[in-house]
Amino acid sequence: MNHLTIVTYHYVRPIKGSKFPGIRGLELEGFRRQLDYLDKNYTIIGTEQVIDASRNGSKLPAKACWLTFDDGYADHSKFVLPELLKRNLHGAFFPPKVAIEDTVVLEANLVHHILSCVDDVKQLVFKLNSCCRSSGIADSEIGSHYNEYAVPNRFDNAETVYVKRMLQHVLPPELRLSISRDFFDEFVGVSVADFSDELYMSVDEVRDLVKSGMYVGSHGSRHYPLDKISSGEQQKDIQQSLNFLEHVGAPTKDWVMCYPYGAYNDVTLSLVKKHGASLGITIDFGVANFEADNLFALPRLDTNDFPQ
């Protein structure tokens, strides 16, 4: 069987001594230990081998493992790249265009850092619901949202999941961005522009990943859940992300799509195939099976699923 263990990473940094010790990420020392573990127990392969398996059906080595890094964080150039190069390992990086080229902070990152700076998430839920109420949302609708979305998962408690869902997907875009920015100002207390410059890689740093032999693929342009936007908007977003890849010197033939939030629909799959993608990766839980899975919707495991 052609199985592939795809590992997902986001924040990788010395967290305890950082400005945001409450952020949910992987400590640098834990990353080093995890690389040692994976290198010993798996065969870490490069993206070219993954693409060859998807395009040509070539066999993957036993216990093949592929390291993937989402969202374009400065952590990836500052901390991850040196560790990979030191071990002669390969990684695949998926930065969204706007995070690298524009002075913005992705909605998800606003929410992550708000949560990292809040002592009591239940109080944050209370404030969020008050903001919704002030915006004209009825108590019955708020209660319905809470009942539907306040469900714990393997990473977060119920209240945290509720805040993430409401501020990343459920509320209307303008309202959720307004609330997130107000909460960011209140709890994080730094300017969005300065925060963006510090959080994400620069264009030159992404180019350095490519020059260092790493793979850079698409994570969309605006980091939107693609299944929530029209086919025309999806087309535009995917094309802009490919233009960005070309701009940083990354391949745009047989490229890899990493869906923002793991979200896609049939239109998305059709578009990425039309634009020449070789495969797509999601946030669905599991080890990828190249003989049975949809190659444009492969599952991944999380760094938290392995020793650190």
PLM feature spans:
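Conserved beta-strand->loop/alpha-helix structural units within folded catalytic cores of enzymes
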Residues: 70-72, 77, 87, 92
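C-terminal active-site subregion of NodB/CE4 polysaccharide deacetylases
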Residues: 1-68, 75, 106-115, 211, ...
